[in-house]
Amino acid sequence: MACPYMNGGDTLPHRVTFMEGGEECQQGVNKVEMGFGQTYPEYLQLDKILTAQKLKSEADGQRVDDEHLFIVIHQAHELWFKQIIFDLDIVRKLLNNTIVDETKTLKIVSGLDRIVKILSLLTEQITLLDTMSPLDFVDFRKYLTPASGFQSLQFRILENKLGVKQERRIKYNAQHYKNVFNDDDLKALNTTEDEKSLLTLIESWLERTPGLKSTSEDEGFWSKYESSVNKYLSDLAKQAEDPSNTEEIKKQLRAEYSKTSDAFQSILDPRQHEQHIRNGNRLLSHDATKGAMMIYFYRDMPRFSQPYQILTFLMDIDSLFTKWRYNHVLLVQRMLGAKQGTGGSSGYMYLRSTVSDRYKVFLDLFNLSTWLIPREYIPMLSPRMVKTLSEHSNLSHSQSSESE
């Protein structure tokens, strides 16, 4: 059999290769010589960025090489924090409307996606410091005092803009987190506390979920959901009392039914939900939680596909911040053990306390799985609601505006 690559002959066909020489690769102009605009170093102001790595150990005549890595990693973090804040402000601006333009939802999704990717990078980037030995860190640690990552203004601004509640913060040396900042920084922090956080904006957005409430034309999602839950619980109770079950199995199934029923009652009863908010166990309002659940159940509908992505990215942001905090805790324990932090905190013990649900902004979204029901119990959408969720509310308006 002839080789399929030989064209029936003994020689290989002509191969396409990249030109490594010749006139084609030299056909261009040197715009720098012609004085066109700024050069790469000028545009990026590299003279400022690349000269900002001042090793304190070197200035003291005892240069420690790993101090350079330590500085670069933290400077890179601050640059990425700035980008996250920039993108977060764009997302917040798009959400900060009585009616969110649904044709802009993709821009919100893209902004959150970018934030997630940056946080993924930072989660891995901090582990680069693991290439530094604890003994090498000790050699230049004395030059850091009283500097501490706790003093990162951008990180605190980012937390506030996301929606970290002040009352949920772990105190730093039994003091308010703002006590380490000067007057100008305090003004910036106070501004972010007064602004609407991403959590607040998402809550308002979810409360307006289409089809959530009953109207004269449609029963609404929530009343149908309550009926479905009651049927689901009734079936669970019947399963527990099945005559074919042994008494031991019946006892176990009854206990499971009781726990499941209590869990559903905590969301079906608005008063119980409000009590959970007062206790600090939940953050989103009852209506916002109902809206999120509706999006979860009907995420395949065109109008809910991007909102579902938004909710997913919000949980990703929380997850990645938790992972970053955890990686930071492990790093500090490895480098310091039980020593006090350079800023005066308890070091590892303080940081470990921040790796908790207290710092999860969108904790309620994680807990939605508690109240999901099997697919066969999910309420059917009415024909009217199918139509509502198949077309963006302001799509027709946008198209008519463009035609004008």
UniProtKB/Swiss-Prot annotation:
The EC number of this protein is 1.13.11.11
Q: What class of enzyme is it?
A: oxidoreductase
Q: Name one Pfam family in it.
A: Trp_dioxygenase
Q: Which residues bind heme?
A: H328
MF annotations from Gene Ontology? heme binding; metal ion binding; tryptophan 2,3-dioxygenase activity
Q: Which residues of this UniProt protein bind substrate?
A: F70, I71, V72, I73, H74, R141, T342
The record's annotation in InterPro entries points to:
Trp/Indoleamine_2_3_dOase-like, Trp_2_3_dOase
Cofactor(s) the record lists: heme
Q: What does the record say about how the cofactor binds?
A: Binds 1 heme group per subunit.
Say which domain of life the source belongs to. Eukaryota
Please give the SUPFAM superfamilies that the UniProt record associates with this protein: Indolic compounds 2,3-dioxygenase-like (SSF140959)
Lipoprotein recorded as keyword: no
Catalytic activity annotation: L-tryptophan + O2 = N-formyl-L-kynurenine
Q: Where does the record place a coiled coil?
A: none
GO biological process assignments: L-tryptophan catabolic process to acetyl-CoA; L-tryptophan catabolic process to kynurenine
- Physiological role: Heme-dependent dioxygenase that catalyzes the oxidative cleavage of the L-tryptophan (L-Trp) pyrrole ring and converts L-tryptophan to N-formyl-L-kynurenine. Catalyzes the oxidative cleavage of the indole moiety. Involved in regulation of protein homeostasis, longevity and reproducive life span. Specifically regulates proteotoxicity due to age-related aggregation of proteins like alpha-synuclein, via its effects on tryptophan metabolism.
Its assembly, as annotated, is: Homotetramer. Dimer of dimers.
Q: Which PANTHER family match?
A: TRYPTOPHAN 2,3-DIOXYGENASE
Name the family.
Belongs to the tryptophan 2,3-dioxygenase family.
Stated name of the protein: Tryptophan 2,3-dioxygenase
Upper classification of the source organism reads: Eukaryota, Metazoa, Ecdysozoa, Nematoda, Chromadorea
